[in-house]
């Protein structure tokens, strides 16, 4: 099932590091880690059944990797180490989608009922340990491999129309697809990535947060990741939901907003904990996952937060 991978030539050198070690590595939130998969539940491929299937022993979404809102019904989807969960509008808890415990590391909703993911399979399948890019068109109940099966593990996965960006942590490479994930090209990455966000007006304009053993920084590309300029030392989870609204949440839970694509940031508020995932919807609506599985929501650009969902 693997399709069209083209290699990039020599990478450029990284920017000079600041003197102190990256707090992202010290916190252990990011970096290149060993693959771990937890066995809970049944196989995921060609699964059927209701959106909301769970059991009394299900711990819920306690190790969150990604968030998405289905534009069809406004439901919040929570991608975790042990499966995909859904919290409908007006609900304060979430329920497992199907009965799979797939480790969904990368997750993005590109259109109504169309989800993209990556990560590691439920161990009761016969799939390889790296899922490459997978797609669901039934709200996460079943998934099909699209590309790079057995070859890539996208810990960062972002879509901008037909353009999809993925950071493959297993091979420390940034990849881009111009055809919704069917074929991929390896492009230059400025550093091992923490996160990436695309300009909602220009899919070739992206900002990335990167971190290495001794350095960290924010980088900007206007050619789809083929070249980069360093913008500063700030690093964190990113969301770019509207033009001129680039949000960053750092490792301490502080929320920042930039109106000039990351050159300058102003502090907005705090989420009250360490962030695990960030999602932007419109100019001022944000969702953030904490490491205990709590999902918070802000409707004022990160100044104040309320609890949207609990495990």
Spans of features found by a protein language model:
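Conserved beta-strand position repeated across blades of beta-propeller domains
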Residues: 68, 107-108, 158, 197-199, ...
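Short glycine/acidic-enriched loop and turn motifs that connect beta-strands
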Residues: 83-85, 120-126, 171-173, 212-216, ...
């Amino acid at each position: 099932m693997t399709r069209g991978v083209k290699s990039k030539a020599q990478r450029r050198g990284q920017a000079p590091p600041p003197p102190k070690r990256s707090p992202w590595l010290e916190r252990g939130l990011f970096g290149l880690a060993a693959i771990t998969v937890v066995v809970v539940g049944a196989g995921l491929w060609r699964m059927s059944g209701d959106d909301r299937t769970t059991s009394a022993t299900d711990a819920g979404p306690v190790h969150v990797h990604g968030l998405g809102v289905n534009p069809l019904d406004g439901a919040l989807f929570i991608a975790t180490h042990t499966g995909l969960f859904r919290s409908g509008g007006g609900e304060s808890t979430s329920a497992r989608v199907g009965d799979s415990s797939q480790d969904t590391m990368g997750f993005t909703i590109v259109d109504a009922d169309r989800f993209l993911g990556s990560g590691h399979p439920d161990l009761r399948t016969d799939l390889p340990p790296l899922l490459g890019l997978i797609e669901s068109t039934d709200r996460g109940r079943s998934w099909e491999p699209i590309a790079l099966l057995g070859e890539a593990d996208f810990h960062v996965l972002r879509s901008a129309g037909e353009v999809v960006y993925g950071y493959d942590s297993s091979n420390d490479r940034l990849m881009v697809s111009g055809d919704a994930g069917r074929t991929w090209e390896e492009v230059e990455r400025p550093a091992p990535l923490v996160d990436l966000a695309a300009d909602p007006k220009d899919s070739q304009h992206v900002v990335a947060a990167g971190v290495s053993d001794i350095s960290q920084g924010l980088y900007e590309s206007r050619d789809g990741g083929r070249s980069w300029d360093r913008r500063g030392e700030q690093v964190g989870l990113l969301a770019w939901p509207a033009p001129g609204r680039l949000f960053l949440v750092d490792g301490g839970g502080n929320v920042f907003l930039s109106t000039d694509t990351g050159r300058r940031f102003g502090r907005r508020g705090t989420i009250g904990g360490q962030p695990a995932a960030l999602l932007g919807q419109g100019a001022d609506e944000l969702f953030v996952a904490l490491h205990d599985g709590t999902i918070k929501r802000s409707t004022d650009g990160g100044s104040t937060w309320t609890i949207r969902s609990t495990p």
